[in-house]
Amino acid sequence: MKEKWYTIDKKNIFKILNTRVEGLTTKEVNIRLKQYGKNVLPKAKQKTFIQVFFEQFKNPIVYILLITMILSFIIGEYIDGAFILFVILIDAVLGSVQEYRSNKNAEALAKLIRIDALVIRNNKEISIPSEDLVPGDIVLLESGSKVPADLRLIETQNLTIDESLLTGESIPREKSAHILSEECSLSERTNMAYLGTSVMRGRAKGIVVSTSSFTEIGNIAKEVLETDDTITPLQIRMQKFTKQLGMLTAILALIVTTILYFKGYAAKEIFFLVVALSISSIPEGLPVVITLSLSISSNKMAKRNVLVKKLNAVEALGSATIIASDKTGTLTLNEQTVKKIVLPNNETYEVTGVGYNDKGEIKPFKNSKLENIDKLVKEGLYNNEASLSYIDNSWVNFGDSMDTALLSLGYKYNLESESFKNDVLGRIPYESDAGYSCAFYKEGENINVSVKGTLEKILSFCTTKTDKEKIRKQNEDLAKEGYRVLAFATGTIKKFKIKDNYKENDIPKLTFLGLVAFVDPIRPDAKEAIKSCKQAGIKTVMITGDHPLTAFSVAKELELCTNETEITTGLELKEVYESGLDNFDKYIKTKTVFSRVSPIQKLQIVESYKRLGEFIAVTGDGVNDSPALKAANVGIAMGSGTDVAKETGALIITDDKFSSILNGVEEGRCAYDNVRKVTYMLLSCGVSEVVFYILSIALNYDIPLTAVQLLWLNLVTDGIQDVALSFESSEKDILKRKPRDPKESLFDRLLKNEIMLIGLIMGITVFGVWIYLIDVLGYEVSVARSHILLLMVFLQNLHCFNCRSEIHSIFSKPIKENKQLIISIAVVLFIQFIVVENSFLSHLLDSNPIPLVSVLYLFLLSLPIIIVSEILKYFERDKIRRNKNWV
């Protein structure tokens, strides 16, 4: 059913769908159910836990660990092999549990259509499950109901539908049954009602033209299900890291093999030694620590109102270079609020407060007097069909958003709305074609009339001496500021007769009262959050279905843009898109605000930014945001949004505050920082082991540490301390850095320098002490090895403090900020001394007791590692200061 139903008249629609006003017969319904199927959306195939579990093994670093594990078992290092297997399984379980809870898009989409529908079948009104609807069914809508399928409206009475979840527009749309032109965008199709949208007021009759996946929401559902998940920066970096690590290990193995070959070692012995060295150089604990780091940051995010559904999204948010935000409900409250009142004599009043509540006051400008708006405020309460009440410690509202805003205005003026509604004798409901609504009410002995609506319509009722041009200028000025404006007028009826229906000719000559300006206010935290995003190197753009003037007004208030040239519309985007992707991408780079945008265009914008090399996070709360949320590098849903958005997004902002996104960025960057810190520690220690290993072989010394002792360092010392580093809090300047390039290798210049320099210093230190113990002091190899093992433990203990920051001094971060690190070092030292002093354990570790004075000397020998690290950091900070930028 791909016809443009909004362009077809009622008679032809009945003909095309082979239906009638009396509705379909039961026989016709059964035939069509077989033809079109149930009115349900396509479901994504849900993965079992086992499937999710095995997917965790599709990771390059896991491949290396699996190979290492197999080699460990081949050469008889069963403990090492078992440990690596344990690490792989733990990592897989942790990842599986997190992933299994996420990504249930189809179920959430289906929730939108689990509603009953009132239909006419066999010339009778009946209620049926919406899933049983078929094209051609006649559906009846009333206030408070949800639209059960895509409908072409054929009759309407005062119908207003909230389509914000589909179009992004904050203002409910007034509907009619009139034919429209082909150029109408989705939000302008006033003779259509779409699945999942809500009827705010009025009644209507419509014909089902599309069901299930053929509806507008169905199209979005298909886009969501067909869009592949994007790869996060951490995944990209780990893939590169794995390749680099594999290459380095291969080069290392080749070097050692060459040395051993020329020294006359047997082939079997060379194989065992090379494999053992390769095993010691692989950071077996890294996958678990990465998962743990992301989990810790995920928990921190939850405490800061960011719920993480997909673990990789934790770090991904910290890499964002663009945040494409929905306007309605994300940057604004989606609660129309009266902000200004302007009287014909130019008296102006500012109204404070935001949203649907009684918080705020009415402030007169200059010589304006508060009592002069008394009549206008009361008219807004008489001529009102919404409700706003304070129930169980919260404000509850229903009805048209602008009517609700007028009730809020009444509360700020200390007036209760219910008493006014009781005096209403009759109404003329708002119709978009008429452009006004009217209420007849009793006030004392008089019967008065209150009329509100578009300016020109209200002025046509007014005959009193009014400077209409002056009022038009007032209205124009308010519209340019992005306000939505209602005009008010009042009059008295001399002869009033109560009847069922009132018409325009029942309205007497009126007196113009003034203009009321409404705005969907920005969220209090949004402006500062956007400013902070800018400092963090993140550009914020707005994508909305609203009018360009409204969008520009909000963007200007948020300081997103200052020039109208930065705004574009859906029609303009369509023209540029058709001219080719290159032109489209260039065009997108120049824009900050995108208005009147369709869901598919949102997706096109996201894809354009990705082609431009940006790493884009998309926020949203409606169904219309789902394709973009899914396609984005990071999808961020609002907690009060639709289930569709929340299930599609990788993150959910539980308090709906834009500032919480900034919290997420901070924690995301912290998570990646911690991954780098752990990598720095593990690899620098691994390099040190390789250095003293190669030096010993090359210079004909016994190896300073046995395979068991190397394993002890890898499993216990590294294994405990690297976990503690995962708990590091974010550094003070983390939100003043530019986002890292998603394509940047984990092994960037800084990390390479740190790992190689510190690893080299540690390795040479250990080898120097080894020579001194053997050649100068004449220690037995086993005794010397005990000293070297303790020296390595001390070096790794102190190096943990170096790893707390790649740039800042260890003295700039209070130790108390990471209590886990202190505990881990204490535990490592305690275990080390217990093992040395216990005869059974020391035998397993091939270790001997060490005199206290030797312990002191070894500790002092490990201190220079801090000095070297501090010098390296000093030069890095100096480089940053000179470049005025982060590496």
Residue ranges of each PLM-predicted region?
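Conserved cytosolic headpiece of P-type ATPases
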Residues: 1-739, 744-747, 760, 774-775, ...
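Generic alpha-helical transmembrane segments
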Residues: 717, 762-763, 786-800
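Membrane-helix interface and helix-disruption motif detector
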Residues: 777-782
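Alpha-helical transmembrane segments of multi-pass integral membrane proteins
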Residues: 754-769, 830
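A C-terminal functional module that forms or caps the active site or interfaces directly
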Residues: 803
